[in-house]
């Protein structure tokens, strides 16, 4: 996941109607930003803070309708409906009418865009893809033929030689590009790209262009070209690349490209541009529609999302996550777990009594100075935090300015002691941060330049009370140059047994005790991306396969200095790989795959951008052919691990196009390798089922297909633990390999039996729509109970 500065959310209360419960707090913060031109926001394309010239007329949004037939009602109210999946619509709506639209009877919930962040030679051998390509002990070789491999990402160079057929024609069937646009009345620009041969046949060519003429959507990142190359890069011709014999000096060789990907002959589809969740949803639907409609019959499809955001309730209930779950019925969607486990960005507290308090410091991830857009920030704290109660019970939340020299005594308290129903409470330093409705506090200004705003409400979907805070502070260099004033978070419980979960967006803030008495640090468990918590997806973590690499400048580089402790020991889970135990009882990710570090193709236009300063030191391979230069580069992250799994799943889909996401997850879990690293190092939750094994998984796919196992008999000889899978917010399935009958009992947390069901066979699908909301313990055939949450 690439790190970018978060947009500075401004606070403008004029004209706002608070308490619109169908708009979540994050959407309300986004609405403030869209309506305010006074405070600059960070533009990741220009890498500078810029002031909007005007308030946009429209914005994209996601609407969860009460009924699938409510589309006409939305359109009658001036809403432009772009796509619908299930009862969720992607729409364009006037910014001035957002509150009115969200209050319509046909609307259950409405969410505005949130920003998300970008989260092979050794790899193919490690997971068995080389054996699959060679057809070792298989009926044939598999390369992804007939399968659509889709990706939604930024920094895509579709004409990289890694994505061309041997005859030089493109492997891409379609590309969409979606970018924010002030000049477009809808607030975004949507462009379509087709192979030239297809484009020439189109009668309507509005905003349609040739893929062969596409350069890139971004000149500042290589991310999408890298992930696509891992998933499906297919160039096997000669390149110049670096090798080493002593892990000290490197030398150049010319030979067959060792850095191609997994699904080398699959059909490629991409959506690129600005990284906002609704643009991503639109892009996912583009890929699904292409797979369903571009051939005589629907094509099997896998989609890679090396993207995410840590802000959210971390379950399957957000509108975005429900949309992904709907799309997951038509394609296998793989989502990166996130790269935030190396810092405590989650905080979970079970309170034993009312009035109990937990305190932590909001600690800058990048201490000292940071220059951006011609301005320097000191100990920058910029981003969002969100705190969730386990039910409707409120809690007291305060953002506190503390004074280290006075024993961390509170200098300023920004209180959020009651449900504000979405109305923000804002403290600011004044000057550049003079905002309508804000409290200009002199002590706050003495400590920081910037602002803090917080609001709270009850989530109408889950019934949980939650609060959010938006923060941007830079240490005042006149009165706080030594950093004695710090920012802290305090939460006080309202009843015994209350549980509160707090998440940072992981961009510039984490939770730390600073080794101060009475303060606690955050936890790594909970660092999982919110988007990775959707139902009907595959969530992927990372483990290490390489911690050094040969570069074209003649040297070998790595993440560890000589004599230092090994930060990325080969075989272990990557320390950054995010994970979490969710409120509904699930542990994520499902599995880990090689993610540190991976060499793959990169965006030529980013490498040749002089502002980025690429040199042979940063490159592991290159080729000049036909007047264009192509490059290969190493990178690491769950962003790299996820397309490893997505590309391998494409090989499985070639073998059996009828695989569902449920089949895929089950086979992944059954065939994952549990070596000594998995069993003896790291956190068990972080590992998921273990190390992804593409080869063993494909053999299982073929075995089940041969005996009608997919969607029929389940093979899980070694699996004795029942698998409980949430299939919706109010439905789940239970599977126990080899069972002839299932007896399922659901208990309350107090141990009272509340539901009892039975069925013949090894699988039971449960419709819990009539159950009361809450946490249940599910016991299958007298075994160990597992926890689920019914919303």
Language-model segments: residues:
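Subtilisin-like serine protease catalytic core
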Residues: 136-279, 298, 328-330, 344-345, ...
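C-terminal subdomain of the subtilisin-like protease fold in secreted/lumenal serine endopeptidases
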Residues: 49-51, 251, 294, 300-302, ...
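Short acidic, glycine-rich surface-loop motifs adjacent to enzyme active sites
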Residues: 266, 288-315, 336, 488-495, ...
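Hydrolase catalytic cores
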Residues: 228, 236, 269-274, 285-301, ...
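C-terminal tail/sorting-segment detector
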Residues: 773-791
């Amino acid at each position: 996941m690439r790190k970018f500065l978060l947009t500075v959310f401004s606070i403008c209360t004029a004209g706002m109607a608070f308490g619109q419960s169908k708009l979540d707090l994050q959407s309300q913060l986004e609405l403030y930003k869209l309506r305010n031109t006074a405070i600059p926001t960070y533009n990741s394309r220009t890498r500078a803070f810029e002031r909007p010239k005007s308030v946009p007329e429209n914005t994209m949004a996601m609407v969860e309708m009460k009924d699938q037939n409510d589309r006409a009602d939305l359109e009658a109210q001036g809403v432009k409906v772009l796509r619908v999946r299930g009862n969720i619509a992607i729409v364009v709506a006037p910014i001035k009418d957002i509150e009115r639209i969200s209050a319509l009877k046909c609307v259950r919930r409405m969410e505005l865009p949130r920003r998300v962040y970008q989260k092979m030679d050794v790899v193919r051998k490690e997971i068995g893809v080389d054996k699959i390509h060679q057809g070792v002990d298989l009926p044939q070789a598999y390369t992804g033929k007939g399968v659509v491999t889709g990706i939604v990402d930024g920094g895509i160079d579709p004409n990289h030689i890694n994505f061309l057929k041997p005859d030089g024609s493109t492997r891409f069937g379609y590309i969409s590009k979606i970018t924010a646009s002030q000049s477009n009345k809808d607030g975004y620009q949507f462009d379509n790209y087709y192979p030239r041969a297809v484009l020439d046949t189109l009668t309507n060519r509005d905003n349609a262009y040739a893929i062969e003429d596409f350069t890139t959507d971004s000149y500042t990142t290589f991310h999408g070209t890298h992930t696509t190359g891992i998933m499906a890069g297919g160039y096997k011709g000669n390149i110049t690349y670096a090798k080493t014999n002593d892990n000290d000096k490197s030398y150049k060789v010319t030979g067959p490209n060792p850095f191609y990907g997994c699904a080398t002959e699959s059909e490629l589809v991409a959506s690129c541009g600005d990284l906002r969740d609704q643009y991503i949803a639109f892009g996912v639907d583009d890929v699904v529609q292409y797979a369903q409609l571009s051939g005589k019959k629907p094509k099997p499809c896998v989609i890679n999302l090396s993207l995410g955001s840590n802000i959210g309730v971390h379950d399957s209930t957000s509108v975005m996550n429900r949309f992904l779950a709907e799309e997951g019925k038509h394609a296998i969607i793989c989502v990166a777990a996130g790269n935030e486990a190396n810092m405590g960005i989650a905080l979970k507290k079970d309170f034993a009594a009312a009035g109990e308090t937990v305190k932590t410091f909001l600690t800058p991830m990048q201490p000292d100075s940071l220059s951006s857009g011609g301005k320097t920030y000191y100990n920058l704290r910029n981003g969002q935090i969100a705190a969730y109660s386990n039910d409707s019970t409120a809690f007291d939340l305060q953002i506190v300015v503390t004074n280290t020299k006075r024993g961390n005594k509170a200098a300023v308290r920004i209180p959020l002691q009651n449900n504000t129903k979405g109305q923000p409470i804002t403290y600011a330093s004044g000057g550049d941060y003079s905002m309508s409705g804000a409290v200009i506090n002199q002590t706050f200004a003495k400590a920081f330049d910037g602002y803090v705003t917080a609001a709270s409400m009850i989530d109408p979907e889950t019934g949980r009370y939650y609060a959010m805070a938006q923060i941007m502070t830079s240490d005042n260099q006149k009165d706080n140059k030594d950093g004695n004033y710090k920012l802290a978070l305090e939460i006080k419980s309202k009843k015994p047994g209350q549980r509160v979960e707090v998440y940072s967006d992981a961009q510039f803030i984490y939770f730390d005790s600073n080794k101060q008495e009475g303060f606690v640090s955050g936890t790594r468990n909970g660092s999982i991306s919110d988007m990775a918590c959707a139902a009907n997806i595959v969530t992927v973590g990372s483990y290490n396969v390489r911690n050094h690499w040969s570069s074209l400048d003649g040297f070998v580089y790595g993440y560890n200095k000589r004599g230092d402790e090994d930060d990325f020991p080969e075989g272990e889970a990557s320390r950054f790989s995010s994970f979490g135990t969710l409120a509904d009882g699930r542990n994520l990710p499902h599995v880990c795959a090689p993610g540190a570090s991976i060499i793959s193709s990169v965006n030529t236009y980013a490498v040749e951008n002089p502002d980025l300063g690429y040199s042979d030191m940063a490159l592991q391979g290159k080729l000049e052919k036909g007047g264009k230069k192509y490059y290969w580069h190493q990178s690491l992250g769950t962003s790299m691990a996820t397309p490893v799994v997505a590309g391998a799943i494409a090989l499985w889909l070639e073998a059996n196009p009828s695989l569902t996401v449920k089949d895929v997850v089950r086979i992944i879990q059954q065939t994952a390798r549990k070596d000594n690293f998995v069993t003896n190092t790291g956190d068990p939750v972080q590992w998921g089922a273990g190390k992804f094994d593409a080869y063993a998984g494909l053999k299982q796919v073929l075995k089940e297909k041969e005996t009608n196992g997919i969607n029929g008999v389940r093979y899980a000889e070694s699996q004795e633990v029942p698998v409980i899978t949430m299939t919706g917010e109010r439905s789940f399935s239970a599977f126990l390999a080899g069972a002839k009958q299932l007896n399922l009992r659901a208990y309350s947390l107090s141990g009272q039996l509340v539901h009892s069901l039975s069925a013949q066979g090894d699988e039971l699908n449960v419709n819990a729509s009539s159950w009361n909301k809450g946490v249940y313990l599910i016991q299958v055939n007298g075994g160990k109970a597992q926890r689920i949450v019914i919303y």
